[in-house]
């Protein structure tokens, strides 16, 4: 039986493969059904490998690459870090953030508001007239203009993961589990995920919702009372989502959902960057607000400092030759970072409050009890953000953080992979017995 990989699609694509899966030993696992709103099917797009036991990854292979695609002047397609670096050379030939458009039809009345936000927040031009589905315009240095579908761009990233995994393992990998945010719960998004898998050379075995995958990675179903509830909060690099899930007859269903496709860790980075742009102006007399190259270097340094402050009280923002011979080397404390982003952190809490209110409305009264809170995404590792979420629930709810938030969805898809292989193996043995 061909082994599969786990792919989690966020601001970056994550790929994991466990040692146990590589040995192709017999697998047992938990049936993880796709999370659904009542009466609806709900997709998600992620593919992951199977760890030896729940919560223990024992990973022999793991890869994470940014969701960037670029086109060099010689016609070469660049993916991941290479593509992001090329953006500094020719920003019109590099794109990112296209996950938000997967399966979307911006000409539909229900998606016009989203379409307007796309125009306001994404720097590249989007053509909505070609084949109904949105196509992204890229322009190389020689002036060549290309229109590329979102599925094709996404498949380029997935194919890069597939190629890297096969080179490492020494054999073909043909199957994957995909995960998508719960917001992508329509058949168009689900179909786009399967189509992306086929373009990349994968059999997309299943499409899961990220909240379901994360909850099952933590084994929430083993502790949750019947019809108990869990809040799943996802704050990634560029998107944020909060949902309330309930467990009914062993399956997760969604009681509420709040999704912001243009809010996340990049907003925190921007606040720090703006702070240091002002500092450079006042201290060195240089205005780098219109200098794209300098801003990119500063933004990268600020993001690095932000991550450091998740586990340290102090960090330094260091950029050599920022502009006109100016070397930047300035301290940034966790307290300063929290002050700069306080209102944005409260925006995350507001997301949680809205989704909890939706869940209470479902019950038509206030009997809703939240049993657990699961965190997804690298931005949820920020200590102040965790503190505010914990305080929202009166300090009585421990946040499920045993598994790293930026890996938990991938591991949840791995668990589902185990179950699929177990079912297929059981079916194969049953057929052999009958014959």
Indicate residue ranges for each PLM-predicted region.
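Oxyanion-binding/catalytic loops of NTP- or PPi-dependent enzymes
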Residues: 2-116, 128, 139-151, 156, ...
């Amino acid at each position: 039986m061909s082994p599969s990989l786990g792919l989690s699609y966020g601001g970056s694509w994550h790929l994991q493969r466990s040692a146990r899966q590589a040995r192709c030993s017999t697998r047992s696992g938990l049936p993880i059904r796709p999370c659904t709103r009542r009466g609806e099917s709900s997709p998600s797009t992620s593919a992951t490998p199977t760890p030896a036991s729940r919560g223990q990854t024992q990973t022999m292979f793991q890869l994470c690459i940014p969701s960037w695609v670029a086109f060099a002047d010689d016609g070469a397609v660049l993916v991941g870090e290479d593509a992001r670096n090329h953006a500094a050379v020719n920003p019109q030939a590099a794109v990112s953030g296209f996950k938000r458009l997967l399966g979307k039809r911006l000409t539909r009345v229900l998606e016009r508001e989203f379409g307007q936000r796309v125009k306001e927040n994404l720097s590249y031009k989007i053509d909505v007239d070609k084949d109904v589905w949105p196509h992204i315009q890229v322009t190389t240095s020689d002036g060549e203009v290309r229109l590329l579908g979102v599925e094709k761009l996404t498949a380029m990233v997935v194919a890069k993961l597939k190629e890297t995994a096969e080179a490492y393992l020494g054999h073909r990998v043909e199957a994957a589990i995909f995960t998508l945010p719960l917001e992508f719960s329509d058949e168009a998004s689900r179909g786009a995920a399967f189509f992306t898998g086929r373009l990349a050379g994968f059999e997309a075995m299943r499409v899961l919702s990220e909240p379901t995958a994360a909850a099952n990675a933590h084994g929430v179903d083993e502790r949750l009372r019947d019809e108990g509830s869990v809040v799943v909060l996802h704050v990634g690099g560029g998107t944020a989502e909060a949902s309330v899930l309930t467990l009914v007859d062993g399956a997760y269903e969604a009681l509420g959902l709040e999704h912001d496709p243009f809010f996340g860790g990049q907003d925190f980075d921007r606040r720090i960057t703006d702070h240091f742009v002002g500092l450079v102006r006042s201290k060195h007399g240089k205005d780098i607000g219109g200098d794209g190259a300098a801003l990119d270097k500063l933004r990268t340094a600020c993001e690095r400092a932000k991550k450091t402050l998740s586990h340290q009280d102090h960090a330094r923002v260091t950029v050599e030759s920022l502009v006109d011979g100016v070397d930047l080397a300035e301290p940034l404390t966790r307290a300063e970072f929290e002050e700069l982003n306080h209102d944005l952190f409260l925006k995350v809490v507001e997301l949680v409050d809205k989704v909890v209110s939706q869940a209470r409305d479902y019950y038509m009264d206030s009997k809703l009890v939240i049993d657990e809170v699961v965190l997804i995404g690298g931005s949820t590792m920020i200590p102040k953000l965790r503190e505010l979420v914990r305080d929202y629930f009166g300090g009585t709810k421990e946040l499920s953080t045993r598994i790293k938030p930026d890996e938990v969805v991938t591991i949840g898809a791995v668990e589902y992979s185990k179950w699929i292989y177990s079912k297929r193996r059981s079916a194969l043995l049953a057929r052999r017995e009958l014959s």
